[in-house]
C-alpha cells in the first residue's frame, strides 16, 4: 500500500494490486449481474452518465445532488469485500456502487464532503482501467492515478475538504468498470 501525502493534509492510500485478478473478476461478474442498478437524474435533471446502486446497514440514507439514496441490505459479496477493505482502514456502513458501461460513462469533478459522512472513503475498482484524477481546490495542483481491476484507494485526512476527484470520460475503447465506494454515514441526531 503506497501512502501519498497531499497538500493541506489530504491522504491517499493506493494499492493497484489489492485483489488478485481472479477474485476481482469474480466480484465484478457477481456485482454486474446481481446488483439493483439504476440510472438517476443528476444535476439540472440530466441523467447521470453511469449506473448506480446503494447498499448498507438498515435505515442508512446517503443524500447527494439533492437525491436520497436509500441503502438496500448488504449482499454476501459486498460484506466480503467490505471486510477486506476494513482490514486496511476504516469502518463502513454504506456502499455506493458506480457502474461505468464504457469510456463515455463518467463522474465529474466533485468532493464527497456531505456533513453526515465520515472523512475516510474506501474505493475499490473492478473491471476496466480508468483514470482517477484529483485537483486541489485552490492551487489547482492535479494528479492522476490508474485504477484497474482490483485497485484500492483510501481517501482520508482532509482530502474531501481541499481536493476534488473525478473519473473523466475517455475516447479509448475501454470495457465496463464497477467502482465501490465504502463510507461511514452518520445517522441524523
Please give the residue ranges for each predicted region:
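Non-heme Fe(II) oxygenase metal-center motifs and adjacent flexible, charged/small-residue loops
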Residues: 1-189
Amino acid at each position: 500500500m503506497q501512502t501519498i501525502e497531499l497538500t493541506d493534509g489530504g491522504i491517499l492510500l493506493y494499492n493497484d494490486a489489492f485483489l488478485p485478478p481472479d477474485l476481482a473478476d469474480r466480484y465484478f461478474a457477481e456485482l454486474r449481474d446481481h446488483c439493483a442498478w439504476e440510472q438517476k437524474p443528476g444535476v439540472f435533471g440530466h441523467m447521470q452518465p453511469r449506473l448506480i446502486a446503494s447498499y448498507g446497514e438498515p435505515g442508512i440514507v446517503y443524500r447527494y445532488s439533492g437525491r436520497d439514496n436509500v441503502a438496500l441490505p448488504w449482499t454476501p459479496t459486498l460484506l466480503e469485500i467490505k471486510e477486506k477493505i476494513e482490514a486496511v482502514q476504516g469502518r463502513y456502513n454504506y456502499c455506493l456502487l458506480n457502474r461505468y458501461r464504457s469510456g463515455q460513462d463518467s463522474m465529474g469533478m466533485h468532493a464527497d464532503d456531505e456533513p453526515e459522512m465520515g472523512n475516510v472513503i474506501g474505493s475499490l475498482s473492478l473491471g476496466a482501467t480508468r483514470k482517477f484524477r484529483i485537483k486541489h481546490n485552490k492551487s489547482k495542483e492535479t494528479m492522476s492515478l490508474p485504477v484497474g481491476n482490483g485497485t484500492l484507494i483510501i481517501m482520508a485526512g482532509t482530502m474531501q475538504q481541499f481536493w476534488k476527484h473525478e473519473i473523466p470520460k475517455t475516447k479509448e475503447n475501454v470495457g465496463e468498470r464497477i467502482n465501490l465506494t465504502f463510507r461511514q454515514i452518520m445517522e441524523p441526531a
